[in-house]
Amino acid sequence: MIDLSSPGAVRLDPSGFEALVDAARHGSAGAPLEAKEALADERLDGVMSVMLDPAAVLRLVVAGPDTRLEHRGWLADGVLVLLLGVRTDLLQLMKTPPAFLPATLVRLTRMRPRHLPERVPAQFAAARLDELVSPDARLRAPALAEANADFAWRLDFWWDGGGRSLTAVDGDLGLRFAYPEVGRLVPVTNTFGYRVLSTVMAST
């Protein structure tokens, strides 16, 4: 499914996205009609070329005990293309200036100001960080419970010659960043979190 009926972002399901990428990569001659129509849509001008030859790639996974959404991004030539997970079966494809990335990440990670009591770091094994955002809820839910978190997120950002990764948890105890080298979840302010997200592209 590729939905071009509404203004703004293009909505599609995972199979529609795969068909769109395949048509852009191999040519639209044998592609489904909806993929051909999407490639001709002005909203996708310059989008597929960025996705097929990016200077940098990002992935953000946001996961609670019962739900998990994955968001992806591609950056090249001053254009940021985002594929946002609305539901597991519904995606939203759009392009935006790279300067909007920090605000987008803040919204997707649900970062917000809060008044919290004094907090202390908590032990959490580095080997279990993947479980916080695992596709398997049987691993994810107990890991989140052990971390005393309502949800977790993992941001991965890769570019030619390097990459960065950050795992965080959030909930009643506020935002905490994972520091795998010491096996701890460390409380941070939302201001600090925003600053970190604002520098995610600094090395590209």
For the regions a language model picked out, list residue spans one by one:
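Short, surface-exposed polybasic-aromatic patches that bind anionic ligands, especially phosphate groups
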Residues: 1-204
